[in-house]
From Swiss-Prot:
It comes from Archaeoglobus fulgidus (strain ATCC 49558 / DSM 4304 / JCM 9628 / NBRC 100126 / VC-16). The keyword Signal applies. One of its GO terms (biological process) is archaeal or bacterial-type flagellum-dependent cell motility. This is Uncharacterized protein AF_1052. Residues 1-34 form the signal peptide. It holds the Pfam family Arch_flagellin. Keywords: Signal. It comes from the Archaea. GO terms for molecular function: structural molecule activity.
Length: 162
């Protein structure tokens, strides 16, 4: 009888220790999973609320230099800080040419044209993007696809000829 009580007690203690160890291992994993879900959900929400549209493209140039100006309307509900706008990518692609520019490249400028004077690109405001002094040999006359990609992957496309 005493043996059974001792055996049962040892099994109970072993069970409690095993359950505690399992909880200590599983709980952090569940917590990390919940954090990942929250992070993905936040990023998806930001993408859904961000929308842009290229409304006009103008190209000027001569035999040596090409300048491309385009205007982008913020049609989404996301308010974008000027630093985030400068993280955008600009692509000009044709059947023979591929050019990529970023906000840190010389000759690339961003200006909010009809804003309210703050450093945010808000719904309804128009962003003027200038890509100036492109070597004409790098960008021969052709039909190009302009792709403007924001920091979060939201993009707008338009075609232009030069």
């Amino acid at each position: 009888m005493a043996r059974e009580v001792i055996s049962t007690s040892i099994l109970m203690i072993a069970t409690v220790v095993a359950v505690t160890a399992a909880i200590m291992v599983i709980l952090p994993a569940v917590k990390d999973l919940a954090h990942s879900y929250t992070s993905v959900s936040g990023n998806l929400n930001e993408k859904v609320e961000t929308d842009i549209e290229i409304i006009f493209v103008k190209v000027t140039g001569d035999a040596t230099k090409v300048n491309v100006y385009f205007w982008v309307k913020n049609t989404g509900s996301t308010r974008l800080d000027a630093d985030l706008v400068r993280m955008s990518d600009i692509f000009f692609t044709s059947s023979t040419t591929y050019l990529h520019f970023t906000g840190s490249d010389t000759g690339v400028t961003f200006t909010i044209e009809n804003g309210d004077g703050d450093e945010y690109w808000e719904r309804g405001e128009t962003l003027k993007v200038a890509v100036e002094n492109i070597d004409a040999n790098q960008m021969p006359q052709d039909e190009y696809l302009l792709t403007f990609v924001l920091y979060n992957g939201v993009r707008a496309n338009d075609y232009f000829s030069w």
